[in-house]
Structures are given as structure tokens and as C-alpha cells.
């Protein structure tokens, strides 16, 4: 605990909060163009082919984004909307592509958690 005199001489340091998604530059989402769409394998205990895309954002950053859901229609030069949110078993993937926005189609035949995958309500 500092004395009053110590605080007069040197003020307390401000705590700087470091962003977990710096490429979005204080925005909730960012538009971008896919430069490469490919699959990659996850870290040690898991095994799969995870679909990811390299995206050039309007902020000027180039980031690797995860494509959630089963199947997708993305290819090079597709316009996508990117949000924050990392994928724990893919190192370097700190962003998600939003399904059902811009050029990204929603997940087909999805019944539950539809809003997260951009799927319209099925005609009952």
C-alpha cells in the first residue's frame, strides 16, 4: 500500500484491457473477402478436418476465420461477415464467419439453434 507522498510523486498505473479480437478494431463485426478456403487439423487429443478461411478484412487485417456448421458454399472472393470468437483446438483461429449473412448461406436442414447458423424457420 503506497503512502500519500508516494502517490503524489507517481500516480497509479491504469490497467490496459487487451482486446481478444484486435482485427475487428472495436467493431462487433467486420466485412471481408475470402482469400483462401481450406481445411486444417485440430490440436492433439482431437481429430477432424475443420473448415477455415483466410479473410482480408475492411480494417486491412488478414485473419483466419472458422466456418461453423455442416457444409458451406464459400470459395475465393466470397464476401463474408466476421465476428470474434476463437476455436479452442485450432491455434491462430480467433474469428468466426457469420452464417446466413452476405455471400455465406445458412446451414441446410438445421432444426435446432437455427439463429446461430442463419437458417430460416422450416414450413411445418
Swiss-Prot record:
SUPFAM superfamilies: Nucleic acid-binding proteins (SSF50249). GO terms for cellular component: small ribosomal subunit. The lineage of its organism: Bacteria, Pseudomonadati, Campylobacterota, Epsilonproteobacteria, Nautiliales. PROSITE patterns: RIBOSOMAL_S12. HAMAP family: Ribosomal_uS12_B. It holds the Pfam family Ribosom_S12_S23. This is Small ribosomal subunit protein uS12. The keyword RNA-binding applies. Disulfide bonds: none annotated. Keywords: Methylation, Ribonucleoprotein, Ribosomal protein, RNA-binding, rRNA-binding, tRNA-binding. The modification 3-methylthioaspartic acid is found at residue 89. It comes from Nitratiruptor sp. (strain SB155-2). Belongs to the universal ribosomal protein uS12 family. GO terms for molecular function: rRNA binding; structural constituent of ribosome; tRNA binding. With S4 and S5 plays an important role in translational accuracy. Interacts with and stabilizes bases of the 16S rRNA that are involved in tRNA selection in the A site and with the mRNA backbone. Located at the interface of the 30S and 50S subunits, it traverses the body of the 30S subunit contacting proteins on the other side and probably holding the rRNA structure together. The combined cluster of proteins S8, S12 and S17 appears to hold together the shoulder and platform of the 30S subunit. InterPro entries: NA-bd_OB-fold, Ribosomal_uS12, Ribosomal_uS12_bac. Part of the 30S ribosomal subunit. Contacts proteins S8 and S17. May interact with IF1 in the 30S initiation complex. One of its GO terms (biological process) is translation.
